[in-house]
């Protein structure tokens, strides 16, 4: 298992599921856009082998949604033309092409068979055969703006891990001896999520140790939150500690074969209205297949005669079982028929992402599969005004790469897409998928258009399992540059420009008024809430549409914000603040009660020892020459933070090991009972010191990692030889060569003199090398140090530690990720892109989307219209602003305030610029007079020290006015220069 490559999806699937995936054999039939999306996601995820089958040659319409085909592929077999590029995504996956017939014997050689965009007769042939032989079967297809997916995993399919949620755990406060036994949980975990009937196991209990080896116990939850278990009468008396952990129950799924499920469809839907629409879509697909059987083709694009034929065929269909009272929606059916010949990249991405996730469920037995039909439509992308719908002539093939898209929307939208200029912020997983969408739909391919790709990050190997535009040779190269070049290869007409500087307050001279004046819209593909909020604020300021998406594991969301049409982006209020919220220092230093506390403490140790200490010492040596009694308090307070490294400069690897061993002793023995006071408060156990044991894995790992990091900091060669280190540790322990603390608590003259001598010695050598934490290099000992320090800290305080991967996730703030959900949210944004570029102006047309692929939840809802606020005769929304035109000579603050009162009836009480107070009616008359006479730009410079940069067109102010209500927020004041 290449854990570095698959690290992000291992947090989603787990190691056992990934091992099953790597051993699986999958047959994929159909390599149009939808099939290519399924293939891409499976190869990125790392299936064992993928066999491609498609007997058809590449045509122009395929290029609208198939990113592995090009104009050079025209006339070539689709599977053969796609094979080489798919193989580049993951060299560990065996990819082959089957060019013969699909026979019963062939099917039995695979765990999963997938048909995409296939004929009904092929579906009815392959589906029942797979059911007969226990081969999991999936069928997916798209027709224009509608799509469907069918799953048949057999009559007795066991799901080993039904949910994405980690098993619940809780710390134990007490366990009674009795029948039943009562498990009291610690005070901070009473509000748990255990339910009656849950199975649990126990671990790390002292005293009542019999429970540690018991089989899973069923619990009943009491009113006070305690758990009732079986008979504990004969067990030993409970003393302390312990953790109760949920055991997930496997679930069995029973699926019908396709031939039966077609007549008795069970659809995934969130409400009755969705069920009825899904039944209509089910009938629509059925009649489209019937039309295709009769005419050898799908209905012609926007041909009214063909659409009427489809409606007539539907009237002859037998009602679905259980739907006899549902009437056929002829208008919906007619619209589906008119656009069914088209092929769209966003639809392929959505259905391909969901289908690939179902394949992974079939292989890994992790997460609940669909039961059994999923229908999806985005017909709201079409104009509501029938006079604006495309004509048959406008949708005729033009032998170009956009023919599949023109068949749905006509040439008008294609022309608009070509002239768009979009800013893509973030070239990670979602960013790569969005560049694919841009390339396939033809966005920014003419001289007036383009795509600016902004990302300051560099490619890491762990990116390659999701960010499909990158290859192993691209590791350590800028994401923006590589992604822009790769997108150009997908569509040579795409005008993609990379920017490797961040989009944040420090670069507003780059992403300035002139830059945003050229941009038609923004796509935010960011994993930082703080960055999302900033980008959204820029879009609101410049009145640009914002398409925004994010994922975490199999969760995903996609949202759209259009000026004056929808609400503006706000996001949860706590998002940005919670990203960097630390634990209380007192908790980290003295009374950790959870593994998370220990992880944070270990990370602080890393930063303090190997980065901050070196920076502090280097800075001090460059700026200070002596320590005097007058400045010793401040100076020593600073240097006290780095006392752990203020020793004789190491000269050899052994010196580094001696230091690491001494620091182990200091942290996990000497300081644990500092002052000789043991305690146990609330949920905290009495701490106990550790005795160093070179044969203990974590003791040894700590010294190995710390010594190597210390050596690197001093520019010395380290060592990865574990046998040699064990031998060295044995000698050191026998000779008791561990160092003593260099400094005492008192900082008198002797201490100052000793410290001065140490610093003088260090100044003679080269500066230290700060070690910056890098989470994705398993050979650099960074994560090893934090893992070992966390584990040892947990041992000190009786906290049950967790595995290496979980600690790495916490310390690296790693977001679980998988290719499937990324593809889906990008496809959803692609649909909203159609609407924005089309110029649709009804907020009810747009969609915010939320999905959870693990549990088959798909929710799409219309965004709210922007809320209207009013003050006297003034009305505004979040998209409005008070504009003050430029005049010569420039206005003074006094004339600006007079203008606002005369034009808008606003008597300003406070005026702010970037939180700097420029004016307050509560000031003294003298201070007001000083400010009122200044010109506005002079005032800003006087108060903030900031001088407006050349080219700046607008200054933005916030204001508070007389008579405003408490919850009122006036629109920003845009002062034109």
UniProtKB/Swiss-Prot annotation:
Alphabetically ordered keywords of this record: Cytoplasm, Ligase, Nucleus, Ubl conjugation
Write down a Pfam family by its short name.
ThiF
Where is this protein chiefly located?
Answer: cytoplasm
Has keyword Repeat?
no
GO cellular component labels? cytoplasm; nucleus
UniProt pathway: Protein modification; protein ubiquitination
Recall the GO molecular function terms of this protein's record. Answer: ISG15 activating enzyme activity; ubiquitin activating enzyme activity
Q: SUPFAM superfamilies, from UniProt? A: Activating enzymes of the ubiquitin-like proteins
Q: Which SMART domains match?
A: UBA_e1_C
Compartment(s) of residence: Cytoplasm; Nucleus
**Could you say which EC number(s) this protein's record lists?**
6.2.1.-
Enzyme class comes to: ligase
**UniProt PTM comment:** Ubiquitinated by RNF170.
Quote the disruption phenotype from the UniProt entry: UBA7-deletion mice display increased susceptibility to viral infection.
The source's domain of life comes to: Eukaryota
GO biological processes:
innate immune response; ISG15-protein conjugation; modification-dependent protein catabolic process
By its UniProt entry, which InterPro entries does this protein fall under?
E1_4HB, E1_FCCH, E1_FCCH_sf, ThiF/MoeB/HesA, ThiF_NAD_FAD-bd, Ub-activating_enz_E1_C, Ub-E1_IAD_1, UBA_E1_C_sf
* Similarity comment: Belongs to the ubiquitin-activating E1 family.
PANTHER family (alphabetical): SUMO-ACTIVATING ENZYME SUBUNIT 1, UBIQUITIN-ACTIVATING ENZYME E1
Function, please? E1-activating enzyme that catalyzes the covalent conjugation of the ubiquitin-like protein product of ISG15 to additional interferons stimulated proteins (ISGs) as well as other cellular proteins such as P53 in a process termed protein ISGylation. Plays an essential role in antiviral immunity together with ISG15 by restricting the replication of many viruses including rabies virus, influenza virus, sindbis virus or rotavirus.
**What name appears for this protein in its UniProt entry?**
Ubiquitin-like modifier-activating enzyme 7
State the species of origin: Mus musculus
